[in-house]
C-alpha cells in the first residue's frame, strides 16, 4: 500500500493510500482532514471542504496538479507539503535542497562498499564517501573491537562505578554522579543541549563525510558504543539520511561538540534531516521513509557520538584533496601562460633543481619540462621565438617550481597529519578493553588539524597570488605583446579587464582569510575547557581560500586560452593543445564582449572535476616513464657558449658579396 508523508502547518502526517488511482487533491484533503482531527479547534476550519490548498513536492518544491493520479505524480513514501491558501510556507520549513558547495554530479545510490576498520581510511576514500560513491560496512576485526569495548561500559554501569561521562555529568558537572535510572536520559539530554550550532547546514557531501568519519572513529573500538547502535548509524549513512548540521558553533575542543551533536540529534529522530528521496523533513519521518528507526541511546553512547575532531578533519580531508587537485593543475595552467607569453624553458633545467632538491620544486620543474619540451612536443609558438633576445622571464614564470613546489610540499605535510587524525580515537574518556578500564585524556583537542589547516591555507593561497600576477601579464599589452585585455577593438570591448579585477579581489580576500585561527583561544565551560583550537574555523576558511584559488586559476586558464587565439595559426605543444581543446569544449573564444561569469564558472568546474589534469596527466606520465632527456635548445636565453662562439665567427651575408 503506498504511503505518503505530508507536511501541513508544521505537522507531519503519514497518509496511507489504498487506491493508487486516487488523486493529488484527495491526498491534500485527507492530510487536512487528519490535521483537523488532531486539533482541538479543528485548526480553524469549519470543515475539510472549507480548506483551499496547493500541494508541492518537498524535494524541489515542484507544484503538483490536484487532478493528477497519485501513482503518476508521486513515488511511494514521497514527501509533500500542503500549503493552505492564505498561509505562507511554514516558517520552520527548510528549503528542500541545501546550498551546494561542490560542483559534483547528482547523487546516485552506490552499489560498492568501503570496509571501515578505524585504521586505514584515506583522505581520498573519505571524499569519495562524501560524494556518495560508496556505502559502508565494518570489518570483522572492527566489530569484535567494538563489542569488547562495550563490555567494559556495561560492566561499569552494572557495578555503578563512577566514571566521567558514563555515570557523571559533563564538563563543569564532572563531579555530579547520575543515578543509574537516569543514565539513558543523561545521554539524550547531552545530545539535545549540545545541539546549539548556527549558520547554514553542511552540504550533503560534507555531512556524509562527517558521518562516515565518525563511523570510522567508532570502529576503532575505543568509544564504548554498542555494535547494534553503530550498525544503525551505518544504515542511516547507507540510506543517505543526513541530519541538519549547522556549520558554525565548534571551538575545536572538547572536540566538535555542537556539529556532532546535531549529527547525533538526527540519528535519534529529532531535528531536521535530508535525503535525496525526501528533501528536508523532520528526522523521524525521513528515517521512517527509509525503513529506519531512531537510535535509542545507551549509557555513554551520546558522548561517543559527539566527542571528537571529526568536523575539523572531515572538512580538512576535502580541503587537502581539493588543494592537491588545484596544485597539480596550477602547473598546467602556468605552463600554458608561459607559452602564450613566449617565455623560456631554461628555468626548468634539471641541473638548476638538482642543486636545490626540494621534492615539490623538483616535481613542478619536471611537469613544466614534460609539457613544454619542444623536442618531444614540437611547439610552433616556441619555434617562433627560439632565437629572440629575451634573457630571462619575470619571477611569476621563472620561479614557478620554487613557488608552486613549496605548495606541493605543504599539502603533503598537511595530508600526513589529516590522515593520522582521521584514523585516530578522539573520544573522552577512552575505553581500553585490553585493560578493562577507561582513561580520561585530551585526544579531542583539535590543535593538530587546526594548525595544519591554517598552514594549508597560507600555502595554497600563494597559487592564486602568483596566478593573479600572471593574469596581469597576459592582460597588459606592454608585457604580453598581445591586445590589451585580450580582446579585439579595445575600447569598444573591455575583454578581461574586470575578470582580472575579480582575481585581484579574491586574492585580497584570501590574505585576510590566511590569518591563522588557531592562534586564538577562548576559555569555555566555566574554565574547565580553558584552551581551545578554533579548528572548525581553520577548516572552513581553508576551504574558502582553496575555492578562491580555483576561481583565480580558472580566470588565468581562460585568459591563457584567449591569448592563444592571437597567436594562431601557430600551435603550442600537444598536451597544451589538448588543454586548449578541453577549455574550448565548454567556453568559446571571445570575439567581442559577452556575459563572462558563466564562462568563469565553466572553467572552475573543469578544475574542480580535475578535467585539466586528466587531459595532461597521460603526457606527463609518458614523459616520466620514457626518461626523455630534456631539451636544451641553442638559444641566447640559455647562455650557450657554443652558440655564442658560432655567432661571433659567422660571416655576415653582406661580406659574402
Curated annotation (Swiss-Prot):
PROSITE patterns: PAL_HISTIDASE. Its EC number is 4.3.1.3. One of its GO terms (biological process) is L-histidine catabolic process. It is an enzyme of class 4 (lyase). SUPFAM superfamilies: L-aspartase-like. It catalyses: L-histidine = trans-urocanate + NH4(+). Signal peptide: none annotated. It holds the Pfam family Lyase_aromatic. This is Histidine ammonia-lyase. It comes from Bos taurus (Bovine). The lineage of its organism: Eukaryota, Metazoa, Chordata, Craniata, Vertebrata.
Amino acid at each position: 500500500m503506498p504511503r505518503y508523508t505530508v507536511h501541513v502547518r508544521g505537522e507531519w502526517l503519514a497518509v496511507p493510500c489504498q487506491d493508487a488511482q486516487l488523486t493529488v487533491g484527495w491526498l491534500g484533503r485527507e492530510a487536512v482532514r487528519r490535521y483537523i482531527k488532531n486539533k482541538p479547534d479543528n485548526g480553524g476550519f469549519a470543515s475539510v471542504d472549507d480548506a483551499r490548498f496547493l500541494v508541492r513536492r518537498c524535494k524541489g518544491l515542484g507544484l503538483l496538479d490536484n487532478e493528477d493520479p497519485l501513482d503518476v505524480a508521486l513515488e511511494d513514501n514521497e514527501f509533500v507539503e500542503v500549503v493552505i491558501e492564505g498561509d505562507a510556507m511554514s516558517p520552520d520549513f527548510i528549503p528542500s535542497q541545501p546550498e551546494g558547495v561542490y560542483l559534483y554530479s547528482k547523487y546516485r545510490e552506490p552499489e560498492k562498499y568501503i570496509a571501515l576498520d578505524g585504521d586505514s581510511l584515506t583522505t581520498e576514500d573519505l571524499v569519495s564517501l562524501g560524494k556518495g560513491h560508496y556505502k559502508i560496512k565494518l570489518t570483522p576485526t572492527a566489530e569484535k573491537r567494538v563489542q569488547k569495548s562495550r563490555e567494559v561500559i556495561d560492566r561499569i554501569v552494572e557495578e555503578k562505578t563512577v566514571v566521567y561521562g558514563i555515570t557523571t555529568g559533563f564538563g563543569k558537572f564532572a563531579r555530579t554522579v547520575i543515578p543509574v535510572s537516569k543514565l539513558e536520559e543523561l545521554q539524550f539530554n547531552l545530545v539535545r543541549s549540545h545541539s546549539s550550532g548556527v549558520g547554514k547546514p553542511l552540504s550533503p557531501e560534507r555531512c556524509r563525510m562527517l558521518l562516515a568519519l565518525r563511523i570510522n572513529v567508532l570502529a576503532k573500538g575505543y568509544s564504548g558504543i554498542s555494535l547494534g547502535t553503530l550498525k544503525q548509524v551505518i544504515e542511516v549513512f547507507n540510506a543517505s539520511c543526513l541530519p541538519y548540521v549547522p556549520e558554525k558553533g565548534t571551538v575545536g575542543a572538547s572536540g566538535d561538540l555542537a556539529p556532532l551533536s546535531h549529527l547525533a540529534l538526527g540519528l535519534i529522530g529529532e531535528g531536521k534531516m535530508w535525503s535525496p528521496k525526501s528533501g528536508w523533513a523532520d528526522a523521524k519521518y525521513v528515517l521512517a521513509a527509509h525503513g529506519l528507526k531512531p537510535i535509542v541511546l545507551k549509557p555513554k553512547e551520546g558522548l561517543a557520538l559527539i566527542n571528537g575532531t571529526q568536523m575539523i578533519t572531515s572538512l580538512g580531508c576535502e580541503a587537502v584533496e581539493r588543494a592537491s587537485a588545484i596544485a597539480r593543475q596550477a602547473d598546467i595552467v602556468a605552463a600554458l601562460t608561459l607559452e602564450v607569453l613566449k617565455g623560456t624553458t631554461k628555468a626548468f633545467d634539471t641541473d638548476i633543481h638538482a642543486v636545490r632538491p626540494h621534492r615539490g620544486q623538483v616535481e613542478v620543474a619536471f611537469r613544466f619540462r614534460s609539457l613544454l619540451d619542444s623536442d618531444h612536443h614540437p611547439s610552433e609558438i616556441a619555434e617562433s621565438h627560439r632565437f629572440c633576445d629575451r634573457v630571462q622571464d619575470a619571477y611569476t614564470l621563472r620561479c614557478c617550481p620554487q613557488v608552486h613546489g613549496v605548495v606541493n610540499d605543504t599539502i603533503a605535510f598537511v595530508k600526513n597529519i589529516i590522515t593520522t587524525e582521521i584514523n585516530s580515537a578522539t573520544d573522552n574518556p577512552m575505553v581500553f578493553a585490553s585493560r578493562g578500564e577507561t582513561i580520561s585524556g585530551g585526544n579531542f583537542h583539535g590543535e593538530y588539524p587546526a594548525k595544519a589547516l591554517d598552514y594549508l591555507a597560507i600555502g595554497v593561497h600563494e597559487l592564486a597570488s602568483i596566478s593573479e600576477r600572471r593574469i596581469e601579464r597576459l592582460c597588459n599589452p606592454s608585457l604580453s605583446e598581445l591586445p590589451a585585455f585580450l580582446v579585439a577593438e579595445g575600447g569598444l570591448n573591455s575583454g578581461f579587464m574586470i575578470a582580472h579585477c575579480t582575481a585581484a579581489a579574491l586574492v585580497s580576500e584570501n590574505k585576510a582569510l590566511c590569518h591563522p585561527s588557531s592562534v586564538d583561544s577562548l576559555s569555555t565551560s566555566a574554565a574547565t575547557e580553558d584552551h581551545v583550537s578554533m579548528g572548525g574555523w581553520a577548516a572552513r576558511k581553508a576551504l574558502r581560500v582553496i575555492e578562491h584559488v580555483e576561481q583565480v586559476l580558472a580566470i588565468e586558464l581562460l585568459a591563457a586560452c584567449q591569448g592563444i587565439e592571437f597567436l594562431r595559426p601557430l600551435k603550442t605543444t600537444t598536451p597544451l593543445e589538448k588543454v586548449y581543446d578541453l577549455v574550448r569544449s565548454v567556453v568559446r573564444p571571445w570575439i567581442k564582449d559577452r556575459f563572462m561569469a558563466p564562462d568563469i564558472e565553466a572553467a572552475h568546474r573543469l578544475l574542480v572535476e580535475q578535467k585539466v589534469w586528466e587531459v595532461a596527466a597521460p603526457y606527463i606520465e609518458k614523459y616520466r616513464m620514457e626518461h626523455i632527456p630534456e631539451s636544451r635548445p641553442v638559444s641566447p636565453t640559455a647562455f650557450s657558449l657554443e652558440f655564442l662562439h658560432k655567432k661571433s665567427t659567422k660571416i655576415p651575408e653582406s661580406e659574402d658579396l
